[in-house]
Regions:
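Intrinsic, short, N-terminal disordered tails of RNA polymerase sigma-factor systems
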Residues: 1-38, 97, 105, 111-124, ...
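Short, charged helix-capping/linker segments at alpha-helix termini
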Residues: 24-34, 44-63, 71-77
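Residues within the DNA-recognition helix of helix-turn-helix
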Residues: 39, 176-179
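Structural recognition of an alpha-helix C-terminal capping motif at a helix-to-coil junction
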Residues: 59-66, 79-91
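DNA major-groove recognition helix of helix-turn-helix
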Residues: 61, 177, 184, 188
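Arg/Lys-rich amphipathic alpha helix in sigma70-family domain 2
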Residues: 74-76, 87-108, 127
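A short pre-motif secondary-structure segment
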Residues: 148-152
């Protein structure tokens, strides 16, 4: 799937280049495209946390990559490409929901747990069941809490980068994260101290 997305990205770059040759041939440096391709698994994971669907997530990531490639000349070197792309994905998702008359704040599920790598036999089954419980608990969180958990605890963004992606103050990120951890801890029968780590 990721190879297919990388091929799509190369195709998108070619199509965008043909549409705007003066902007993209010179302005989309190879390192930009290379880093963008390397981020595809993380972008897809974030998009899936928003959409609840692998197919819709792939469409969202493709649209975000197209937009990023068209705007590559506006990307500021030295800033985090991942945070910029997460923000593009989130904004496209919200715009899409609004275009279809849906409320972006409504609950959208996260897909069922994927297989757990590097585990076998009973350990794999237990880890997969635990992952399924965690994903189900995350899916039950309000959207604002789910976004913060995914960006900070799963994608590894700092509070500052998460605040930038979500366009909220850092204090809001911290309070949403604390509430999300408390709700997850309650749902999983543990304490917030044992929840996912900080960045």
């Amino acid at each position: 799937m990721l190879d297919e997305m990388a091929n799509r990205l190369h195709m998108v770059k070619g199509v965008a280049s043909a549409a705007h040759p003066s902007r993209l041939d010179a302005s989309v440096p190879s390192p930009f495209a290379t880093e963008l391709i390397a981020l595809l698994p993380r972008l897809r994971r974030f998009a899936r946390s928003l959409t609840g669907s692998a197919d819709r997530a792939d469409d969202l990531v493709q649209a975000a990559c197209e937009r990023a490639l068209r705007a590559a000349d506006r990307f500021e070197p030295g800033t985090r490409l991942d945070a910029w792309l997460f923000r593009i994905i989130r904004n496209l998702w919200i715009d899409g929901l609004r275009a279809h008359g849906q409320d972006p704040s409504r609950h959208l599920p996260i897909e069922a747990a994927e297989a757990v790598p590097n585990a076998d036999g009973p350990a794999r089954i237990e880890a997969t069941l635990t992952l399924a419980k965690v994903r189900a608990a995350i899916a039950e969180l309000p959207e604002q809490h789910r976004e913060v958990i995914v960006l900070v605890c799963i994608e590894g963004l700092s509070y500052r980068d998460t605040a930038e992606v979500l366009d909220v103050p850092i204090g809001t990120v911290m309070s949403r994260l604390a509430r999300a951890r408390a709700k997850l801890a309650e749902a999983l029968g543990t304490t917030p101290d044992q929840m996912l780590g900080d960045r």
